């Protein structure tokens, strides 16, 4: 089982489908271990196998407990074209236990679900309520600024979108987003 997990982690970036096969093999050998189910859920998520990912992430939560994995589960609902369920998950009782970067990620997913449903103003408010701050720095701040810029762009508020892509560039100390190229495209 452990060898399959190691192989999966080795392959996940370059071959998510191959990594998923190793994750499934690990589950076949140790399906009652929470970390195995969580890993398989993440691998299925990375391979865009939304239904499998959602099932495995739910199983991992049943085994291990706690509010973790909600953002990924909500994003799976989006992948399954069920944005209303994603919002319900993001706003449900369990979400009250989510804090910090996990809460920011959950709100980004919720905002995306609202965009999927055409609720652009609701998406903007969701991101504002997540702690949007143009002076914040770090990966989560960059992701939040970037998501906000995306919704502004979808709302045809191009000038404001460019401003927030600029904030994302400033916040993104490790260049984890493509905010710089998005900003350049808007400035052309």
Model-inferred region functions:
Residues 1-28, 39, 45:
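Alpha-helical segment of the N-proximal tetratricopeptide repeat
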Residues 10-11, 43, 74-76, 113, ...:
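Residue-level signature for tetratricopeptide repeat
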Residues 12-14, 47, 80, 117, ...:
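Structural motif corresponding to the intra-repeat A-B loop/turn of tetratricopeptide repeats
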Residues 62-67, 95-96, 121, 125-132, ...:
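TPR/TPR-like (Sel1-like) alpha-helical repeat modules
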């Amino acid at each position: 089982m452990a060898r399959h997990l190691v192989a999966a982690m080795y392959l996940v970036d370059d071959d998510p489908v191959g990594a998923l096969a190793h994750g499934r093999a690990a589950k076949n050998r140790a399906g009652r271990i929470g970390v195995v189910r969580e890993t398989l859920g993440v691998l299925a998520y990375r391979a865009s196998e939304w239904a499998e990912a959602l099932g495995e992430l739910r199983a991992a939560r049943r085994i291990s407990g706690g509010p973790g994995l909600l953002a990924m589960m909500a994003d799976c609902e989006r992948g399954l074209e069920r944005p209303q369920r994603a919002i319900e998950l993001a706003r449900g009782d369990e979400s009250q236990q989510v804090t910090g970067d996990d809460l920011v990620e959950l709100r980004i997913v919720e905002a995306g679900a609202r965009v999927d449903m055409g609720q652009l103003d609701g998406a903007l408010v969701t991101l504002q309520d997540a702690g949007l701050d143009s002076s914040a720095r770090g990966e989560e701040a960059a992701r939040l600024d970037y998501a906000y810029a995306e919704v502004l762009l979808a709302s045809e508020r191009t000038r404001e979108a460019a401003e927030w892509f600029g904030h994302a560039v400033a916040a993104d100390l490790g260049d984890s987003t493509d905010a710089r190229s998005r900003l350049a495209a808007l400035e052309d």
